[in-house]
């Protein structure tokens, strides 16, 4: 699972996901990408499940870039614990994703294989996504 080696703070505020992505919204490294169409938190487990799906379908023949990183902690309290006594313990890590963010990029495979691999990976994610190609200049 992905998680930072160290962070400035152990626990973070939830925050809000307003507006569209202004950064990380173009295919930069690969030839094809998977773009988010909705705002959400994507957990490190979901990222890993999607990554495994892509690498298995392409038979490890594709170059893969994961464009999001889970750098925010989500805390949870123990079941049946009373209110108060501070914030809960860190439960898992999430990446904050806005609409338009590129989640994964692929290169070195034909377009139909890339499209199918990213489509299969999209089933592992909790949002609607779109397959996009790089704009060649």
From Swiss-Prot:
- What does the subunit comment say? Part of the 50S ribosomal subunit.
Organism taxonomic ancestry: Eukaryota, Sar, Stramenopiles, Ochrophyta, Bacillariophyta
Name the chain's protein.
Answer: Large ribosomal subunit protein uL16c
Q: Which family does it belong to?
A: Belongs to the universal ribosomal protein uL16 family.
Provide this UniProt record's keywords sorted from A to Z. Answer: Chloroplast, Plastid, Ribonucleoprotein, Ribosomal protein
Q: Which organism is it from?
A: Trieres chinensis
Subcellular location field: Plastid, Chloroplast
Known InterPro entries for this protein? Ribosomal_uL16, Ribosomal_uL16_bact-type, Ribosomal_uL16_CS, Ribosomal_uL16_dom, Ribosomal_uL16_sf
Report the superkingdom from the record. Answer: Eukaryota
SUPFAM superfamilies from the xrefs?
Ribosomal protein L16p/L10e
Of the GO CC terms on this record, one is: mitochondrial large ribosomal subunit
- Which is a GO BP term held by this UniProt record? mitochondrial translation
Q: Pfam families this protein is in?
A: Ribosomal_L16
- For this protein, what is any one GO molecular function term? rRNA binding
């Amino acid at each position: 699972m992905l998680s930072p080696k160290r962070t400035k703070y152990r626990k973070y505020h939830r925050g809000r996901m307003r507006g569209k992505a202004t950064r990380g919204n173009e295919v930069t490294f690969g030839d094809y990408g998977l773009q988010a169409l909705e705002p959400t938190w994507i957990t490190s487990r979901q990222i890993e499940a999607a990554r495994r799906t892509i690498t298995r379908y392409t038979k490890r023949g594709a170059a893969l870039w994961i464009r999001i990183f889970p750098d925010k902690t989500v805390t949870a309290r123990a079941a049946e614990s009373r209110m108060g006594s501070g914030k809960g313990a860190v439960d898992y890590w999430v990446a904050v994703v806005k609409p338009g963010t590129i989640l994964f990029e692929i290169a070195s495979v034909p377009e139909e294989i890339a499209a199918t691999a990213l489509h299969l990976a999209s089933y592992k994610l909790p949002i609607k996504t779109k397959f996009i190609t790089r704009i060649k200049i």
